[in-house]
């Protein structure tokens, strides 16, 4: 099982993988001949940030003092980090005191009622560990038969990486896998001592070579909105879009709502599945 701080949320590993994605030309540096590794060299990052090379090396090696906010902001600019990547950098370098070591496992009854009251489109509540905590009938009909699954099986990361039918259910499996790993990376940065999260990462690392490969990239992803396709044994491929909303009164629970374009085959498929759930 991975060590919490060194694998689940390694600042050094994160910095190394991020600088490998930035070329000298991206940041206005002149080419300097053949390079043994892609991306920026350590001394180039140090120069861009205004640090000594020695300090930056110690930062990547985990031997430096806690970096200031000014240093982290400069690193984020030099490495061209997105908002989610910048937030993850801060989580790794400056852990928040008093941050919860666990995520909420229970859904408020009123919030469950909200999910159940969404009649014509799939909706569910999940946490940042990818545990599905509540769902409506259409979500169970389209995505997975959640009522028939044991609680630990209602985890989308397990289903993506350990279910042999995952590539059939998710036509865009590569993107689904990458975004799932990115969500877990973000969660690990926020809560490196979450025992359930550490166990999940260990289980996926042992059971899935694809997960191990993606985990090593240190990719981070914040689930917000976008396209999503499912393949269903009865209605075939269903192309939807999803939107996520932070569940009120929670830190890490998301309401995810999937919608179909009006008049589309996907809308017809959802209508048919809805009829089946009411039959």
Positions of the model-derived regions?
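Amphipathic, well-packed alpha-helical segments that form the structural scaffold of globular domains
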Residues: 16-23, 90, 94, 116, ...
């Amino acid at each position: 099982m991975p060590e919490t701080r060194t694998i689940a949320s390694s600042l050094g590993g994160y910095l190394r993988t991020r600088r490998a994605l930035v070329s000298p030309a991206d940041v206005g540096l002149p080419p300097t001949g053949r390079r043994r590794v892609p991306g920026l060299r350590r001394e180039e990052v140090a120069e861009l940030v205004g640090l000594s090379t020695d300090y930056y090396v110690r930062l990547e090696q985990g031997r430096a003092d806690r970096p200031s906010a000014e240093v982290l902001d400069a690193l984020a600019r030099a490495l061209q980090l997105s908002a989610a990547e910048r937030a993850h950098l801060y989580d790794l370098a400056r852990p928040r005191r008093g941050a919860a070591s666990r995520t909420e496992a229970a859904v408020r009854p009123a919030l469950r009622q909200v999910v159940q009251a969404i009649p014509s489109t799939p909706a569910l509540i999940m946490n940042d560990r990818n545990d599905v905590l509540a769902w409506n009938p259409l979500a169970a009909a389209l995505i997975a038969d959640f009522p028939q699954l044991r609680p630990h099986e209602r985890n989308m990361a397990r289903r993506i990486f350990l279910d042999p039918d995952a590539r059939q259910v998710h036509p865009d499996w590569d993107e689904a896998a990458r975004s799932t790993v990115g969500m877990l990376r973000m969660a690990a940065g926020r809560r490196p001592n979450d025992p359930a999260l550490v166990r999940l990462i260990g289980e996926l690392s042992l059971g899935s070579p694809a997960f191990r490969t993606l985990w090593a990239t240190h990719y981070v992803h914040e689930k917000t909105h976008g396209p999503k396709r499912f393949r269903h044994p009865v209605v075939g491929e269903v192309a939807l879009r999803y939107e996520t909303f932070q569940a009120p009164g929670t830190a890490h629970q998301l309401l995810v709502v999937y919608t179909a374009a009006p008049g589309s085959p996907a809308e017809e498929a959802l209508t048919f599945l809805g009829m089946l759930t009411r039959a």
